[in-house]
Design a protein with these regions (language model features):
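Short secondary-structure subsegments characteristic of cysteine-rich extracellular domains
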Residues: 28-34
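N-terminal acidic leader/helix
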Residues: 1-28
Length: 69
């Protein structure tokens, strides 16, 4: 399973959906609005999306448990 950075976890938490697929779609939709001047955010988003595609749904739900208080 890939390791997520703190920044990736924050980004995923901001666009968290009910499922892994919904979260990926939320991030992809958000990335359409990133300007050329925000290359760091674009890279962070792309990396988070890629890593989300590399994990299982069970891993995703386990990771989401860390996001809830």
């Amino acid at each position: 399973m890939p390791t997520f950075t703190e920044d990736e976890c924050i980004l995923i938490g901001c666009y968290l959906g009910e499922t892994r697929e919904e979260t990926i779609l939320n991030l992809e939709e958000m990335s359409e609005y990133i300007s050329n001047e925000e290359a760091d955010l674009d890279l962070l988003t792309s990396t988070a999306i890629y890593k989300l595609t590399q994990i299982t749904d069970d891993d995703f739900y386990a990771m989401c448990d860390d996001f809830t208080p």
